Every structure is written in structure tokens, then in C-alpha cells.
Swiss-Prot record:
GO terms for molecular function: ATP binding; ATP hydrolysis activity; ATP-dependent protein folding chaperone; protein dimerization activity; unfolded protein binding; zinc ion binding. Zn(2+) binds at residues 15, 18, 37, 40. InterPro entries: AAA+_ATPase, ATP-dep_Clp_protease_ClpX, ATPase_AAA_core, Clp_ATPase_C, Clp_protease_ATP-bd_su_ClpX, ClpX_bact, P-loop_NTPase, Znf_CppX_C4. Residues 3-56 form the ClpX-type ZB domain. The keyword Metal-binding applies. This is ATP-dependent Clp protease ATP-binding subunit ClpX.
Length: 420
């Protein structure tokens, strides 16, 4: 659509989709009575590419191949190549098993639930969420720390299946092919080596309660949630084909693994092991069932999680990529917020590195990146709507380190100053 700017000899053209003028964009393409800018064209291409990736060319089994699953995971999760490969193969095999369950009964394929082990903020939950989106199945996240044994204050394990059922709009058949992610599973480790001291209702007791639904049982789920009572009607959900992914940071597990691998050596030639010599993620790759047993998981629970995927620590380079590259990257989100005020936002390269360093120092991983950016931009976002003529805000390393305020560039006078 064409709009005339008052006082101009020529009419100014505007994008029919985003409303930006021809002076604000690189290119404006004309069509019959409409115009579209290069930015909107790029956005449309992103949407088409995304839909094309999600609606896969399926393998002959009707399930995305491991490589196709991996390609989509790469769009959302930076790094973690080993974990992506393990998860892609496990999920492909799981849904291939479901599709072939009724075709040939000679060999019964067992369910392979997955255990994700990795430091906090490395992408465990995001990986599970993305997998569910790729396969297009119901997905729910449960917090293991809120679960207790039946009969005690807290959530019953059946509430996990209720959440999955709600995610499937109470379609039982769809829910029975869904994915459940149980977070903080390391927090339900056995609290004491001696089980006779006291009843461990939130540790070993929860592990025992989870065994049946993870292996496969017909769970009686109260539709409204809450505790069961005799007069209540129940929905019957078969958990045999539900894929369970358990995740946790497993703080301290690396010491158990290192102690097993060190052995004993003495003499002048003996190598003295430095605990900081290897990154936590590297040590996790050597995990064995015995290590998880020593950590506090019971043998039966470990047996229900045959596939183990370990995640690596995120270094500075990986954190900078997380800030800028994914479709929903934090920097892109803040740039879009500032665009809504018609203001540009620029982070210098050294600023991004400073954010990454601060996240590593705090040991929060990718989870801490947003809070760092929020703290840095808080004053600017507070004052910005009241400013006139601001064209751009620039953030450098000094701003991230707290030694300066963001640089504010004005459109007309090009004045520079700090945010109040």
C-alpha cells in the first residue's frame, strides 16, 4: 500500500506487512497494490524452511530418520553432538518399534527409556521438548522433587500421566504414544545407605513408584487430578509405549566416576590426578551403572533407563552461539523488543564474550544468560519509552562488567550518553 508523506514531493512507500517505510529497509518489492520489504521476505522464508523441516520426508517406516531428527535439534540446541546422536537414534528406534509392534511377533522389542546426565543449563529439557515437537506427540515435564510415595503428602506418580493426558487433550490413544520428561531425577536418589533407618518417601520410595509406569502398566488416572478416592471415576492409560526421558545434573557423580578410574599408583613416576584437569561433561561420558548405584539410584530404576546420553559443559564459544544463533536466541529476542520501540540494539563481540564469561563464573550454564542480559538492559528498557529520537543502543564489554552504561545514539543530533 502506498502512503504519501505530508510535505514530500514524492509519495513514500511502505511495506504492506510490517509497515516500515522504504527508507527503513534495504529493498521494497512491488506487487499489485501491495509492497513487501526484504526483511518480511526473509521472515517468510524462515517460516517455510521451518515447516519443511518439521514435516519431514519420512523414512520407509513413517518415522524421521536419526539424521533428520539431528538436523532439527541443531536448530534449537547448540553443541551437545554426542547427546543429539544418542537421542536421535533412541527416539527413531522407539517409534519404529511402535509402528512394527503389530506386524511381526517373532521378536519383541523392549522399550529403551533415556537418562540424560549433564551440568545445569546445558539443554536437557530443551532437547526433550524439541524431540516431542519433531515427532508431533504429546509432551509433558514432571519435577521429580515434588513426587512422593502413594499415601504421603505430595504428588503421586500417576499425576505425571494425568499431565500427559491433558497435553493430549484427554485423547488416551495419543497420550499412550507421548513423551514424558522427568527433571531433577538425581534429587530422588537414596538418602541413606541403610534403608532400615527411616522410610525414604521422597527418594527411594519415588524410584520404586516410578518403576511400574516406566516399564509399562495400565495406570488409573483421576481425570481431575488430586488424591484418589473410592467414588472417583478413573481413566485407564497404558504406559507401555510412552517414552520416558529422565534428566538431572547429578552433582557429585563426577567424583564417583573419577574415584573409580583413578586406581592406585605410587612412586616418582605416578601421575597425580587434578580434579579440575577434565571438564565435568568429559567425566560423565565414562559413567557406568555401578556409578549410578553408588550415587543412590536403585538397580531396578537404573535397569529401566538403558540408554544414557551425557551432555558437555558449555564453553565461552558455545554460550556465545546460544546467545545469537538459535531461532529463539536471547539476543534476537531483545533486538525484537527494542524494534518495537523503533530502536536498534547492538551487542559488540566483546560484550557477548563477557556475558558468556559471567555465566561460566556463576556456573548457571545457558540458563543464566537471560538474567545477565536482563540486568544489563533493565535501566535502559525502563527509560527508553520516555526518550525522543533514540536511534540505537550499543552494549559493549564494559557495560556487561558494570563499568559503564549502554551507549545511546540519537537519530538527529547523534548525541551520546548513558541511560539514567
Amino acid at each position: 500500500m502506498t502512503k504519501a508523506a505530508s510535505g514530500d514531493s514524492k509519495s513514500t512507500l511502505y511495506c504492506s506487512f510490517c509497515g516500515k517505510s522504504q527508507h527503513e529497509v534495504r529493498k521494497l518489492i512491488a506487487g499489485p497494490t501491495v509492497f513487501i520489504c526484504d526483511e518480511c521476505v526473509e521472515l517468510c522464508m524462515d517460516i517455510i524452511r521451518e515447516e519443511h523441516k518439521i514435516s519431514f520426508v519420512k523414512s520407509k517406516d513413517g518415522v524421521p530418520t536419526p539424521k533428520e531428527i539431528r538436523e532439527v535439534l541443531d536448530d534449537y540446541v547448540i553443541g551437545q553432538d554426542h547427546a543429539k546422536k544418542v537421542l536421535s537414534v533412541a527416539v527413531h528406534n522407539h517409534y519404529k518399534r511402535l509402528n512394527h509392534a503389530t506386524k511381526n511377533n517373532d521378536v519383541e522389542l523392549g522399550k529403551a527409556n533415556i537418562l540424560l546426565i549433564g551440568p545445569t543449563g546445558t539443554g536437557k529439557t530443551l532437547l526433550a521438548q524439541t524431540l516431542a515437537r519433531i515427532i508431533d506427540v504429546p509432551f509433558t515435564v514432571a519435577d521429580a522433587t515434588t513426587l512422593t510415595e502413594a499415601g504421603y503428602v505430595g504428588e503421586d506418580v500417576e499425576n505425571i500421566i494425568l499431565k500427559l493426558l491433558q497435553a493430549a487433550d484427554y485423547n488416551v490413544e495419543r497420550a499412550q504414544r507421548g513423551i514424558v520428561y522427568i527433571d531433577e531425577v538425581d534429587k530422588i536418589s537414596r538418602k541413606s545407605d541403610n534403608p532400615s533407618i527411616t522410610r525414604d518417601v521422597s527418594g527411594e520410595g519415588v524410584q520404586q513408584a516410578l518403576l511400574k509406569i516406566m516399564e509399562g502398566t495400565v495406570a488409573s488416572v483421576p481425570p481431575q487430578g488430586g488424591r484418589k478416592h473410592p467414588q472417583q471415576e478413573f481413566l485407564q492409560v497404558d504406559t507401555t509405549n510412552i517414552l520416558f526421558i529422565c534428566g538431572g545434573a547429578f552433582a557429585g557423580l563426577e567424583k564417583i566416576i573419577s574415584a573409580r578410574g583413578q586406581g592406585t599408583s605410587i612412586g616418582f613416576g605416578a601421575k597425580v590426578a587434578d580434579p579440575d584437569e577434565r571438564r565435568t561433561g568429559e567425566i560423565f561420558r565414562q559413567v557406568e551403572p555401578d556409578d549410578l548405584l553408588r550415587f543412590g539410584l536403585i538397580p531396578e530404576f537404573i535397569g529401566r533407563l538403558p540408554v544414557i546420553a551425557t551432555l558437555d559443559d558449555l564453553d565461552e564459544k558455545a554460550l556465545v552461539k546460544i546467545l545469537t544463533e538459535p531461532k529463539n536466541a536471547f539476543v534476537k529476542q531483545y533486538v525484537r523488543l527494542f524494534e518495537m520501540e523503533n530502536v536498534g540494539l547492538t551487542f559488540t563481540e566483546d560484550a557477548l564474550m563477557a556475558v558468556a564469561r559471567k555465566a561460566i563464573q556463576r556456573k548457571t550454564g545457558a540458563r543464566g544468560l537471560r538474567s545477565i542480559l536482563e540486568g544489563v538492559l533493565l535501566d535502559t528498557m525502563y527509560e527508553l519509552p520516555t526518550y525522543d529520537g533514540v536511534e540505537e543502543v550499543v552494549v559493549n564489554a564494559e557495560v556487561i562488567e558494570g563499568r559503564a552504561q549502554p551507549l545511546i545514539i540519537y537519530a538527529e543530533r547523534r548525541d551520546k550518553g548513558g541511560a539514567a
